[in-house]
């Protein structure tokens, strides 16, 4: 809303430039876009109420660090909201190492139990990972004939930084 403020982060200068241009075009004054990586967010400790990610975490080679960073930038009581592809069972090695499937967010998908463990290790609570079975129809179109939906599905992932948690930026 008008009282809020949004910080967008992308690792490519082209996307940051496009986002800035779109913000100007839409006359949004409460947004800014920064160049950075999800493993090292250019955001101060405890500065965010919400961290949102859409199909990016799968591309990270260091997912535990991604969750530690999200935890760091969230204020106490802040929320994490993610939409990404998760593994419902361990994909075969040829799928895990397939560059096309990795780029398509399927080959590098983490098991749900592993994601929960990473998030808990980062300090998150109230973790909820909800697979979306209806996503299988469009995921199958990403890699026809590969049976990827035997192993992966889109999910919404939510978690909360505990209110009792204090970090360097919390009052």
Locations of the language-model features?
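A short glycine-rich, Lys/Arg-flanked "PGG" loop and its adjoining helix->strand segment in the class I
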Residues: 64-79
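Short, glycine-/aromatic-enriched active-site segment of Class I SAM-dependent methyltransferases
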Residues: 86-106
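Class I S-adenosylmethionine-dependent transferase superfamily signal
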Residues: 55, 69-71, 119
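Class I SAM-dependent methyltransferase SAM/SAH-binding core
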Residues: 1-41, 65
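C-terminal lobe and adjacent flexible extensions of AdoMet/dcAdoMet transferase-like proteins
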Residues: 118-171
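A short SAM/SAH-binding and catalytic strip from SAM-dependent methyltransferases
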Residues: 49-62
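A short acidic, Gly/Pro-enriched loop at the edge of an enzyme's catalytic core
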Residues: 39-50
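Helix-to-beta-strand junctions that scaffold the AdoMet/dcAdoMet cofactor pocket
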Residues: 1, 59-61, 74-76
